[in-house]
Amino acid sequence: MKHSSKIIVFVSFLILTIFIGGCGFINKEDSKETEIKQNFNKMLNVYPTKNLEDFYDKEGYRDEEFDKDDKGTWIIRSEMTKQPKGKIMISRGMVLYINRNTRTTKGYFLISEITEDKNGFAHNKDKKYPVVMKHNKIIPTKPIPDDKLKKEIENFKFFVQYGNFKNLKDYKDGEISYNPNVPSYSAKYQLSNNDYNVKQLRKRYDIPTKKAPKLLLKGDGDLKGASVGRKDLEFTFVENKEENIFFTDSINFKPTERDES
């Protein structure tokens, strides 16, 4: 009888230990998700910045690579990529280099066609259209005979100008990844079509699917680091071998290149 009681006590203790350990693991995961959200909030607070010239006065995270007199350059990029079934993958987007030293901005509109050869190797065919920004307006620096393309470039809006993450804290059940050796971290969430940012993307782009996207937040650097470094966003609507639809956005604060100073 005593032997049976000992077994029951031992089994009960083992179950309790596993339960407590499991709760500890869950709490640890929740804590890491909260930490990642807090870190992303530092960058996502710039969404929306309707006037891109406001970046001239925004300070980002400065590491040892910055010269003391360098105010830094913001690099912003937004791009929509679509590959309908049976067709090639085409990306359309824009990159701007916002120089805080000279308070000037230049960049390019990019159309990229990605094909795959019979051996499975990908090949890119890129076409760039140089632009500058003045008074928050995008201006092509070379003649563009295609009026439709010219208007697309001139009317282009970056995601940072209309995106909003004030409800980030409400995103639940994220897939969390953290590698302290790099260090790098990410969080992935399944969104609904009622999400504000999803509605904004559908309003601005022809997205040929009713599927709601997954949002992937990616960052590099110490989670406890201050201010904004590099962060990437990806809204994936469809992803498989035959069809792909995704939108990417990134904000990066870097030392200014010498020829840009």
Swiss-Prot record:
Keywords: Cell membrane, Lipoprotein, Membrane, Palmitate, Signal
Cell compartment(s), UniProt: Cell membrane
Lipid attachment in record (N-palmitoyl cysteine): 23
Principal localisation: membrane
Lipidation (S-diacylglycerol cysteine): 23
Membrane topology recorded in Swiss-Prot or TrEMBL: Lipid-anchor
Example of a GO cellular component annotation carried by this entry: plasma membrane
Source organism superkingdom: Bacteria
Short name of one Pfam family: DUF576
Keyword Transferase belongs to the record: no
Signal peptide bounds: 1-22
Family: Belongs to the staphylococcal tandem lipoprotein family.
Stated name of the protein: Uncharacterized lipoprotein SE_0142
Organism: Staphylococcus epidermidis (strain ATCC 12228 / FDA PCI 1200)
